[in-house]
Regions:
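Short sequence/structural segments immediately N-terminal
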Residues: 61, 108, 152
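Short pre-active-site segment immediately N-terminal to redox-active cysteine/selenocysteine motifs
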Residues: 59-63, 71, 139
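Soluble non-cytosolic domains of exported or imported proteins
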Residues: 46, 50, 58, 91, ...
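N-terminal secretory signal peptides that target proteins for export/translocation
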Residues: 1-5
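Bacterial N-terminal signal peptides
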Residues: 8-20
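C-terminal capping alpha-helices of c-type cytochrome domains
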Residues: 116-152
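Gly/Gly-Pro-rich "capping" loops immediately C-terminal to redox-active cysteine motifs
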Residues: 42-46, 55, 65, 69-106, ...
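Electrostatic cytochrome c docking/interface patches
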Residues: 25-59
């Protein structure tokens, strides 16, 4: 379990790396949580795994590799604070992945992972991000599409 000081540092790192250009994201898409999943794709959108890969490895957009290691050998300095993404698609279905990206605290209230598609209840939000999600509905679906393919 991470200490509160480590969690504060992680939140600060995430907030500091968010570029202003991405602050123009639209409001959140409506969704329904069923059990431990968001079964329906956000906005009825279809994700693209190649775009999802670009989001996951981009340390200015998804920021996933700051904490998660994964099957991206060309990416240096992957994190080791969060679960390995290598076989995440075998462990979790698309709905479970979607909920963890949209609002990981619904699954684990103690997580340091930010809610990527929520605007309420967030802590230490930069003014440029107030009222805006970190990822659009399309970006969430793209990341889900990628993660669902990671089955090794």
């Amino acid at each position: 379990m991470l200490t509160s000081s480590v969690r504060r540092i992680l939140f600060a790192l995430c907030a500091a790396t968010l570029p202003t250009a991405y602050a123009q994201a639209p409001a959140v898409a409506p969704y329904a949580v069923t059990g431990a999943a968001i079964v329906a794709p956000l906005g009825g959108l279809t994700g693209d795994a190649l775009r999802g890969r670009a989001i996951v490895v981009d340390r200015q957009v998804g920021m996933c590799l700051l904490c998660h290691p994964g099957p991206f050998p060309e990416e240096r300095f992957q994190g080791n604070l969060a679960p390995d993404l290598a076989s995440i698609g075998r462990r979790l279905d698309a709905g479970q992945l979607r909920l963890r990206i949209v609002d990981s605290r619904r699954v684990n209230p103690e997580t340091t992972m930010p809610a990527y598609h929520r605007i309420d209840g967030r802590m230490r939000v930069a003014p440029a991000w107030s009222g805006r999600p970190l990822l659009t509905a399309q970006q969430v679906e793209d990341v889900v599409a990628l993660l669902a393919t990671l089955r090794d």
